[in-house]
């Protein structure tokens, strides 16, 4: 396994990349599906238990996995986290060959606030993942948008 850490603009979010080792005995597995893991934490922090352990579980299923530590603290509006999610998706697609992933097979899984972020990525921005899985998606997060900045709901 190879681990790469990338800092994403504009908010200095951190994307940790967990990449499978290539095996000459498995030439058809050179390009893998990707799973973007978005931990919860109430938009106040990113939970460690919903990051690397989840990424490793997806790696065991054949994915290359990526954990997004988005901008999160008590004073930051969630639009910054949404920017971080978009930056992560842009990075994955732009660097798909280097990361040995299929840009048409990028899924995202999020927990709690991370689930809300994945759902928001899937409905509000063009940088959406191919598939989004949300677990215990956050409630009462509308209050975190700055005045006048909350995007319109899709559909």
Label the predicted regions.
Residues 45-49, 53, 76-83, 108, ...:
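Residues at secondary-structure transition points
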Residues 31-40:
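Short beta-strand element of the alpha/beta-hydrolase
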């Amino acid at each position: 396994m190879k681990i790469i850490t990338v800092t994403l603009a504009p908010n200095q979010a951190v994307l940790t990349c967990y990449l499978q080792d290539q095996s000459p005995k498995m030439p058809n597995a050179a390009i893998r599906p990707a799973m973007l893991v978005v931990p919860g934490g109430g938009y106040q922090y990113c939970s460690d238990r919903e990051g690397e352990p989840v990424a490793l579980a997806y790696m065991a299923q054949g994915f290359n996995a990526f954990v997004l530590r988005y901008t999160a603290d008590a004073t930051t509006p969630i639009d910054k986290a949404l920017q971080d999610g978009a930056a992560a998706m842009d990075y994955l697609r732009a660097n798909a060959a280097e990361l040995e992933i299929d840009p048409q097979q990028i899924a995202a899984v999020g927990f709690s606030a991370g689930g809300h972020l994945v759902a928001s990525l899937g409905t509000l921005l063009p940088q959406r993942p191919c598939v989004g899985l949300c677990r215990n998606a956050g409630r009462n997060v509308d209050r975190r948008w700055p005045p006048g900045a909350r995007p319109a709901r899709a559909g």
